[in-house]
From Swiss-Prot:
Disulfide bonds: none annotated. Keywords: Heme, Iron, Metal-binding, Oxygen transport, Transport. GO terms for cellular component: extracellular region; hemoglobin complex. Transmembrane segments: none annotated. Belongs to the globin family. Gene3D superfamilies: Globins. Signal peptide: none annotated. The gene is CTT-10. InterPro entries: Erythrocruorin, Globin, Globin-like_sf, Globin/Proto, Mb-like_M. This is Globin CTT-X. GO terms for molecular function: heme binding; metal ion binding; oxygen binding; oxygen carrier activity. The lineage of its organism: Eukaryota, Metazoa, Ecdysozoa, Arthropoda, Hexapoda. It comes from Chironomus thummi thummi. It comes from the Eukaryota.
Length: 151
């Protein structure tokens, strides 16, 4: 796959450093995604139709946030080593399969990306170089996920 390659060392360093600054904000990140995009929240059977403000501080919400945002953290952690590329592809492929069965769309992944990027920008020193690194990280992830969604 000619489009699949690891990010360069500089990009990995930037992505990992900016991720580290927010990596423990799982509940706040998921809350921000759901608040901005109720259509994403509606895809979660445990939360569909519920008041976001009422569920934000519940154990169920914290567990889901940890699982969802933790997955993203796992991807970020694996970046940068050519030895991890097969593991990254498997992780992303499996994520694509799971989300395809739930009817998640490419547009909803785009909404997640948009909200996650805004959250990262708001909690880090941000510049065009960091933005480019994150664009590459999302592009690499989504190339595998979208391949599955389109199959």
């Amino acid at each position: 796959d000619p489009e699949w390659h690891t990010l360069d060392a500089h990009e990995v360093e930037q992505v990992q450093a900016t991720w580290k600054a927010v990596s423990h904000d799982e509940v706040e990140i998921l809350y921000t995604v759901f608040k901005a995009h109720p259509d994403i929240m509606a895809k979660f059977p445990k939360f569909a139709g519920k008041d976001l403000e009422a569920i934000k501080d519940t154990a169920d919400f914290a567990v889901h946030a940890s699982r969802i945002i933790g997955f993203f953290g796992e991807y970020v952690t694996l970046l940068g080593s050519s030895g991890n590329q097969a593991a990254i592809r498997t992780l992303l492929h499996d994520l694509g399969v799971f989300h395809k069965t739930r009817g998640i769309t490419k547009a909803q992944f785009g909404e997640f990306r948009e909200t996650m990027t805004a959250y990262l920008k708001g909690h880090n020193k941000w510049n065009a170089d960091i933005s480019h690194s994150w664009d590459d990280a999302f592009d690499k992830a989504f190339s595998v996920i979208f391949e599955v969604l389109e199959s």
